[in-house]
Amino acid sequence: MGASHFVLCGDDDDKVLGTLVDVTETFGGHFTAEHHGKPLGYLRHFAKQGGQIVHLTMYGEDFESTTPSIPTDAPIAVVVGGAKVPGEIYKLANYNIAVGHQPHSEVAALALFLSELMGGVAGSEQFPGARLEVKPHPSGKVVIDHEEDSDTSQ
């Protein structure tokens, strides 16, 4: 469900990459992250390898009507950027998709797009290797710490 790899392009930020590693170690799953200094070079190489490029922008086509036409049998790179996205991205992208035509949160746009692409959100999905497991509860927090459970059973 969702993304399996994150590429931070442009300025290197070890804090962002470290946070992604920490979240994966805590909540499980198979997720990797890397930095790439040249976004256009990365995307050109990705496209040459047969990947599809989806650019989330407020200037693109409506995401609800366009997303179902995106093939999911090949890798997909989702470009999420702010005001400084180079104009060439619009030409490189196989799809320029708008989650609304007003300024919006890039994180929210990514979440909505992935939900539409993947056919909804799996609310109770548990990732393998999780240290913490969050259980749904109507009036509070229920978190199981699998490390504490294994420590107390010894």
What does each model-identified segment do?
Residues 5, 52, 94-95:
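Well-ordered beta-strand positions
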Residues 17-85:
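S-adenosyl-L-methionine/SAH cofactor-binding core of RNA-modifying enzymes
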